[in-house]
Every structure is written in structure tokens, then in C-alpha cells.
Amino acid sequence: FTPQQWRAQVAYLPQKPVLLGETVAQAIRLPFTLAIRQSARTKQGPRRISPTDALPDGRIRETLDNMGCADIDLNRPPHDLSGGQAARVSLARTLLTRPKVLLADEVDAGLDDDNADKVARILAKAAADGMAIVRIRHRPPDGRATRVMRLADGTLTQSGNAEADGTATGSTSTGSTVEGSVA
């Protein structure tokens, strides 16, 4: 893979949400603002598609609503969001880029159990829709991974199918979630 191919197929979701922009909508559009692939060719030559055209408010609103974020106003400053809201907005932004692989680095760290569960449900749905997800956590397994690996002191101490050890509630045929726990 070239670096460009890697970036187009793999997304990294950090533990602490980074939401740049004056509004939630601007923060979500950031990858589309930076994406070179958003240019289009017209009779006059290459033309840059505006981020708003590439990702209209309606699509952002629909995505947030489907993620249980109907209470988040697109014009709200991102720095006014709660920790759980910021995590879900960051996750929405990442999912809208439609990566094939998502590396989720402790995205539920610092969240209360309710918000951590919401994030886990969203990730499980993305896996069911065909995305491969690697989720790193310091929490106990939550039953959403199809495979679980555990590291302790730099050594792999557990690896296997989550259904076999009773930590998964179900698996998907198109995508998978690998949960890595660090002790």
C-alpha cells in the first residue's frame, strides 16, 4: 500500500476527541475540507467541491440522529459538548469517511457507562455493516467484540473468538470487531 491508499482505507480514532471548527458541522466536515479526492472535473478543468456540497447538513444530521445524537445542534460550538457528545461527534466524523478499517484507541476512556455503551453500540453497528474495527480498551469486555485479545506486561495472554469464551453477544458475517484489552 502507498501512504495515500493506507489513509483512504484506514482511520484512527483517538482517545481524546479533537474537534476543530466553530461549529459541530465544521468539525465533522474537517476531513472533507482536507480531502484532495474531493475535487471534480468539469469542462473548465478541475474544480474543488466545497465541503458543504461534499457533506450536506442533512447527511450530518441523519448520521447524528442515527447515533442517538438528536440533541446536538449542528451550529453549536464543539467546545460546548459534553465528553460523551464529543466522543460521538468524533466517531460520526470518522464513520462518515467510510474507512474499511477503524482503529479505535480507548474511545470510551473517561466516559460514563451510559456513553461508553452508546459508543460501543455505534461501533458494533459499523462492524455489522462491514467495517473492520480494532478497539483498544482498559475496561472489561462488554460483549460486543467478535474476537478478544488481552495484553499483560507486553505479553499476549489471551486471544480467541469472543463467542467461545462467552464475552460476545453475537458476531457479524461482514465485519468484525477485535477488542484488545491492556492490563
Predicted features, each with a name:
Residues 102-106:
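Catalytic Walker B motif of ABC-type/P-loop ATPase nucleotide-binding domains
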Residues 122-135, 143:
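Conserved catalytic loops of ABC-family nucleotide-binding domains
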Residues 91:
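Hydrophobic anchor residue at the start of the ABC signature
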